Design a protein with these regions (language model features):
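Short histidine-centered beta-strand/loop micro-motifs
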Residues: 39-42, 66, 78-79, 84, ...
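HotDog/MaoC-like acyl-thioester-processing domains
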Residues: 3-5, 80-133
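Well-ordered beta-strand positions in beta-sheet-rich domains
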Residues: 18, 73, 119-123
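Short structured motifs
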Residues: 71-77, 91-92
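Hot-dog-fold acyl-thioester-processing enzymes
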Residues: 1-71, 131-132
């Protein structure tokens, strides 16, 4: 079951995203970004974690036509080892409608079994849903 973007309200929790970033995915990310492979032999590049979270969010909540990714903030708190089990908790921090747009801010907290490793906020805007009679 997927989440309807237009049904989101402040305080709503989206399903948690559980994942691991295997070494092969790290190598593919490094090849795509041109980053130095030697610098990431054990840990995951921080922005790769953000990409995983955004991909999981888009899988859970397909965006409506006309949606825009309005902003992204990440605070990287600790290194993550390749293959380490991770869980991202997603909560709607803000939701408003302005000038025909639905604006949603989703707060993220990424955890390992023992610690928080990332906090972030994603802002998405889309034309407000049409009211049908």
């Amino acid at each position: 079951m997927s989440t309807d973007f237009h049904a989101l309200r402040r305080g709503d929790r989206l399903p948690a995203l559980a994942f691991r970033v295997p070494a092969g995915d790290v190598r593919a990310y490094l090849a795509a970004t041109g980053e130095d492979v030697a610098a990431w032999r054990v840990s995951v590049p921080p922005l790769a974690l953000g990409a995983y979270i955004l991909a999981g969010l888009m899988e859970e909540m397909p965006l409506p036509d006309g949606a825009l990714h309005g902003g992204q903030e990440f605070e990287f708190l600790d290194a993550v080892q390749q293959g380490e089990p991770l869980v991202a908790e997603l909560i709607v921090a803000q939701q408003s409608e302005r000038q025909g747009s639905n604006i949603v801010v989703i707060a993220t907290e990424l955890r390992t079994a023992s610690r928080v490793v990332l906090r972030g906020r994603t802002t998405v805007m889309a034309p407000a849903a049409a009211v049908t009679a």
